[in-house]
Amino acid sequence: MLTLGVNIDHVATIRQARQTVMEPDPIAAAVLAELAGADGITAHLREDRRHIQERDVEILRKTVRTHLNLEMAATKEMVEIALNLKPDYVTLVPERREEVTTEGGLDVAGNLNYLLGVVEQLQSRHIPVSLFIDPDVAQLKASAQTGAKFIELHTGKYANAPTADDQARELGSLAIACDIALELGLRINAGHGLTYWNVRPVAELPGMEELNIGHSIMSRAILVGMERAVREMKLAMLGLPF
């Protein structure tokens, strides 16, 4: 059954805008999201700590009752944090300090030997790894070579497509990627730029297990509250009115 992972990074972004306060608390947001039916909580601990802090992930690990997906760069520092934290799984993502948000998928094919070691290090300690990648055949094959349990398909090009034809073409690329991933024995998640109005076609892709969504839910939560925003996204994923 398709599940929803709620990304709470943007709650921390608002908090960090006023660095002397502790509000809003992403921990409270995670609790409300779970109460509303979220199947998992996602948090990205970036190297520059621009939003989520180590304090946040440490408390989340103790309080999340569904599962905790820690997004992080494949650096020595972050691997050590993950090994100590022991999240339910880790999603490895690329990072550039100048980007506003993650702009593309991980180049697994170009960094295969290094990522082989990172994946082995984490999974040998019973922390499943997901690789955030573009829907590209070479990246899919390289991801399978690492031994990672999951991939997370980057849906940004689909979400940001300027025309309906472009969006249909990007959706087709995602569908092909799903078919290849299943043939390679990879489990499939997806995320980036998904909204209440574009999520359903991605939710219907073959083998899709979890969608990780943050900005759209948090934007709506400002207007209608966290619990309603999460419930409505679950309905949108099913193609039901909300």
From Swiss-Prot:
Its main location: cytoplasm. InterPro entries: Aldolase_TIM (IPR013785), PyrdxlP_synth_PdxJ (IPR004569), Pyridoxine-5'_phos_synth (IPR036130). Keywords: Cytoplasm, Pyridoxine biosynthesis, Transferase. The active site is at 44 (proton acceptor), 71 (proton acceptor), 192 (proton donor). It catalyses: 3-amino-2-oxopropyl phosphate + 1-deoxy-D-xylulose 5-phosphate = pyridoxine 5'-phosphate + phosphate + 2 H2O + H(+). 3-amino-2-oxopropyl phosphate binds at residues 7, 18, 193, 214-215. 1-deoxy-D-xylulose 5-phosphate binds at residues 9-10, 46, 51, 101. Coiled coil: none annotated. One of its GO terms (biological process) is pyridoxine biosynthetic process. GO terms for molecular function: pyridoxine 5'-phosphate synthase activity. The record marks 152 as: Transition state stabilizer. It is found in: Cytoplasm. Its EC number is 2.6.99.2. One of its GO terms (cellular component) is cytosol. Pathway: Cofactor biosynthesis; pyridoxine 5'-phosphate biosynthesis; pyridoxine 5'-phosphate from D-erythrose 4-phosphate: step 5/5. Catalyzes the complicated ring closure reaction between the two acyclic compounds 1-deoxy-D-xylulose-5-phosphate (DXP) and 3-amino-2-oxopropyl phosphate (1-amino-acetone-3-phosphate or AAP) to form pyridoxine 5'-phosphate (PNP) and inorganic phosphate. Homooctamer; tetramer of dimers. Belongs to the PNP synthase family. PANTHER family: PYRIDOXINE 5'-PHOSPHATE SYNTHASE. This is Pyridoxine 5'-phosphate synthase. It comes from Synechocystis sp. (strain ATCC 27184 / PCC 6803 / Kazusa). The gene is pdxJ.
